[in-house]
């Protein structure tokens, strides 16, 4: 999860989030190169006292500043399209976890595993135990097996919410009367935190999302 003074993305816990981090680094490298080039040209322009009034065209220069930006855009677009395709395909055939947004808590069910609907409320600050995280702990968190695909289906019982789990690379709207679907694949066991990412009313900040990834054998025992 995020820590104090963090300047980068959260540590990835799923393949798709790892791909997102690589794409972020790829895009940042291009942006830093553009920034450096423009800065050097700006400094050169500021300190250059020479000028020419006889040159009316420079076809080579015009060709370069047309082709180079087009090349950079293609270099940025190709991995972006690949990542977009992976996001759409991830977890579509996995175990179904249904998340229903309410003001201001989440309820979950796993129909394919015979886990009926249960509510997940934030634990008040005065009830936290040592080591718990403020505004992130819940009284009843969904369990999922790590190493298997999970297909999250979201909807809402009232207003628009957003179910987000940053370390898994998941964020999607929960809209009343509509089912949205997105998948993730937990690489490691652990507890993963998120929050509602759509302003949904007075207690929007008190609507955490906590998912625990456990071993497949333990998950089967829990379901039985």
Curated annotation (Swiss-Prot):
<keyword id="KW-1133">Transmembrane helix</keyword>
<dbReference type="InterPro" id="IPR011759">
    <property type="entry name" value="Cyt_c_oxidase_su2_TM_dom"/>
</dbReference>
<keyword id="KW-0460">Magnesium</keyword>
<feature type="topological domain" description="Mitochondrial intermembrane">
    <location>
        <begin position="1"/>
        <end position="26"/>
    </location>
</feature>
<dbReference type="GO" id="GO:0004129">
    <property type="term" value="F:cytochrome-c oxidase activity"/>
</dbReference>
<dbReference type="Pfam" id="PF00116">
    <property type="entry name" value="COX2"/>
</dbReference>
<dbReference type="InterPro" id="IPR036257">
    <property type="entry name" value="Cyt_c_oxidase_su2_TM_sf"/>
</dbReference>
<dbReference type="GO" id="GO:0005507">
    <property type="term" value="F:copper ion binding"/>
</dbReference>
<comment type="subunit">
    <text>Component of the cytochrome c oxidase (complex IV, CIV), a multisubunit enzyme composed of a catalytic core of 3 subunits and several supernumerary subunits. The complex exists as a monomer or a dimer and forms supercomplexes (SCs) in the inner mitochondrial membrane with ubiquinol-cytochrome c oxidoreductase (cytochrome b-c1 complex, complex III, CIII).</text>
</comment>
<feature type="binding site">
    <location>
        <position position="198"/>
    </location>
    <ligand>
        <name>Cu cation A2</name>
    </ligand>
</feature>
<keyword id="KW-0999">Mitochondrion inner membrane</keyword>
<keyword id="KW-0813">Transport</keyword>
<protein>
    <recommendedName>
        <fullName>Cytochrome c oxidase subunit 2</fullName>
        <ecNumber>7.1.1.9</ecNumber>
    </recommendedName>
</protein>
<feature type="binding site">
    <location>
        <position position="198"/>
    </location>
    <ligand>
        <name>Mg(2+)</name>
    </ligand>
</feature>
<dbReference type="InterPro" id="IPR034210">
    <property type="entry name" value="CcO_II_C"/>
</dbReference>
<dbReference type="Pfam" id="PF02790">
    <property type="entry name" value="COX2_TM"/>
</dbReference>
<feature type="binding site">
    <location>
        <position position="161"/>
    </location>
    <ligand>
        <name>Cu cation A1</name>
    </ligand>
</feature>
<feature type="binding site">
    <location>
        <position position="200"/>
    </location>
    <ligand>
        <name>Cu cation A1</name>
    </ligand>
</feature>
<comment type="similarity">
    <text>Belongs to the cytochrome c oxidase subunit 2 family.</text>
</comment>
<keyword id="KW-1278">Translocase</keyword>
<feature type="topological domain" description="Mitochondrial matrix">
    <location>
        <begin position="49"/>
        <end position="62"/>
    </location>
</feature>
<keyword id="KW-0186">Copper</keyword>
<keyword id="KW-0679">Respiratory chain</keyword>
<keyword id="KW-0812">Transmembrane</keyword>
<dbReference type="GO" id="GO:0042773">
    <property type="term" value="P:ATP synthesis coupled electron transport"/>
</dbReference>
<feature type="binding site">
    <location>
        <position position="196"/>
    </location>
    <ligand>
        <name>Cu cation A1</name>
    </ligand>
</feature>
<dbReference type="InterPro" id="IPR002429">
    <property type="entry name" value="CcO_II-like_C"/>
</dbReference>
<feature type="binding site">
    <location>
        <position position="204"/>
    </location>
    <ligand>
        <name>Cu cation A2</name>
    </ligand>
</feature>
<feature type="topological domain" description="Mitochondrial intermembrane">
    <location>
        <begin position="83"/>
        <end position="224"/>
    </location>
</feature>
<feature type="binding site">
    <location>
        <position position="207"/>
    </location>
    <ligand>
        <name>Cu cation A1</name>
    </ligand>
</feature>
<dbReference type="InterPro" id="IPR001505">
    <property type="entry name" value="Copper_CuA"/>
</dbReference>
<feature type="binding site">
    <location>
        <position position="196"/>
    </location>
    <ligand>
        <name>Cu cation A2</name>
    </ligand>
</feature>
<keyword id="KW-0472">Membrane</keyword>
<feature type="transmembrane region" description="Helical">
    <location>
        <begin position="27"/>
        <end position="48"/>
    </location>
</feature>
<dbReference type="InterPro" id="IPR008972">
    <property type="entry name" value="Cupredoxin"/>
</dbReference>
<keyword id="KW-0479">Metal-binding</keyword>
<dbReference type="GO" id="GO:0005743">
    <property type="term" value="C:mitochondrial inner membrane"/>
</dbReference>
<keyword id="KW-0496">Mitochondrion</keyword>
<keyword id="KW-0249">Electron transport</keyword>
<feature type="transmembrane region" description="Helical">
    <location>
        <begin position="63"/>
        <end position="82"/>
    </location>
</feature>
<dbReference type="InterPro" id="IPR045187">
    <property type="entry name" value="CcO_II"/>
</dbReference>
<comment type="function">
    <text>Component of the cytochrome c oxidase, the last enzyme in the mitochondrial electron transport chain which drives oxidative phosphorylation. The respiratory chain contains 3 multisubunit complexes succinate dehydrogenase (complex II, CII), ubiquinol-cytochrome c oxidoreductase (cytochrome b-c1 complex, complex III, CIII) and cytochrome c oxidase (complex IV, CIV), that cooperate to transfer electrons derived from NADH and succinate to molecular oxygen, creating an electrochemical gradient over the inner membrane that drives transmembrane transport and the ATP synthase.</text>
</comment>
